[in-house]
Amino acid sequence: MKLKSIMSQCQFIIGATSIKSLPDFSIPEVALAGRSNVGKSSLINAITNNRKNARISSKPGCTRQINFYLINKGLMVLVDLPGYGYSKADRATVNSYICLMEYYLLNRKNLSKVVLLIDAKVGFKEIDLDFIRWLEVHQILYQLVLTKIDRVQSNVLDVIVSDVQNFNLNFIIYPIINVSSKCKQGIEELIYEIAQCIKK
């Protein structure tokens, strides 16, 4: 099966807003996480080659539920987690979906890995490092993806990658992938890395 065809059939299943509404799948899941406005929705549309799959907003913090997408009629599930960081929602709402996200990550037995998106324009923020530390503490596998690389020079990317190598990380999956949803750069490599969960 060709890489692009793996992700070409993408069906939105449910937006879970509570623990009870989380769907029960036995197939592999890959979750996309990242700071608010890091480009998760754009990336989902890029890897599925459909601009309509995930709603894109210019306002950060709009995803307030866990969105589940069935890939290729049940080959796997792509999961869009709420963005952490800035949000216009009230504190109670933010705490609610953060708790839901933590519950999902800690209890999902069919979760293959978390794809953690980092905005290459700004690099690592403290909140990104806090999330990485949280994943490490709870021994959750994750892979880093640098987004919006069309807006930065290659030497900036080199610095970010160098920073990662200086961290003491035990549950990171390499390689670090550089992507641009706008230019479609790195998309095929990312699809390949996501598809590895199918082979396990």
From Swiss-Prot:
Keywords: Cell cycle, Cell division, GTP-binding, Magnesium, Metal-binding, Nucleotide-binding, Septation
Signal peptide: none
Pfam families cross-referenced by the UniProt entry: MMR_HSR1
Positions that bind GTP: 34-41, 61-65, 80-83, 147-150, 179-181
Classification via Gene3D superfamilies: P-loop containing nucleotide triphosphate hydrolases
Amino acids binding Mg(2+): S41, T63
InterPro entries tied to this protein: G_ENGB_dom, GTP-bd, GTP-bd_ribosome_bio_YsxC, P-loop_NTPase
GO biological process: division septum assembly
Residue ranges occupied by any EngB-type G domain in the UniProt entry: 26-200
Required co-factors: Mg(2+)
MF annotations from Gene Ontology: GTP binding; metal ion binding
Annotated family: Belongs to the TRAFAC class TrmE-Era-EngA-EngB-Septin-like GTPase superfamily. EngB GTPase family.
Role, per record: Necessary for normal cell division and for the maintenance of normal septation.
Protein name from the UniProt record: Probable GTP-binding protein EngB
Protein species of origin: Ehrlichia ruminantium (strain Gardel)
Lineage: Bacteria, Pseudomonadati, Pseudomonadota, Alphaproteobacteria, Rickettsiales
